[in-house]
């Protein structure tokens, strides 16, 4: 996963510019569906990295509605390049391996590494403007 972004120095908001998702999962049986799975999982992973925070109060989720639990929309998504590396797996049907939710795994580490390249000691997600501001103050 390659992630390119900008961080607003005044608001500490991360603006994703481009994501490149590289996935190896054997031979894709249905390439268009595999592409969609990668795009959707990458969007979920980006939301997990930048937006989605679970708030618990008295053992219950306090932000369980779409009005107060922020998830990414198409307007939040950067340019996305998907690269599928075909490497047929002899133990799978028609050379396939599982794809599943694998695309969700890359965005959070990519976002944190991008922020660390700016000298920010980010140790948790989501990397909200408030968190980035606190990392800036601690630096």
Model-flagged regions — what are they?
Residues 1-139:
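Cofactor-binding beta-sheet edge motifs in enzyme active sites
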């Amino acid at each position: 996963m390659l992630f390119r972004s900008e961080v607003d120095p005044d608001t500490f908001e991360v603006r994703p510019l481009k994501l490149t998702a590289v996935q190896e999962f054997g031979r894709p049986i249905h390439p268009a569906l595999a592409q969609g799975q990668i795009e959707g999982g990458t969007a979920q992973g980006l939301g997990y990295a930048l937006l989605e925070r679970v708030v618990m109060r008295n053992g219950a989720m306090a932000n369980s509605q779409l009005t107060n639990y922020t998830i990414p929309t198409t307007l939040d998504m950067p340019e996305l390049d998907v690269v599928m590396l075909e490497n047929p797996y002899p133990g799978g049907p028609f050379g396939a391996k599982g794809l599943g939710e694998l695309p969700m795994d890359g965005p959070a580490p990519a976002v944190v590494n991008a922020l660390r390249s700016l000298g920010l000691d980010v140790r948790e997600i989501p990397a909200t403007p408030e968190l980035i501001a606190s990392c800036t103050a601690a630096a």
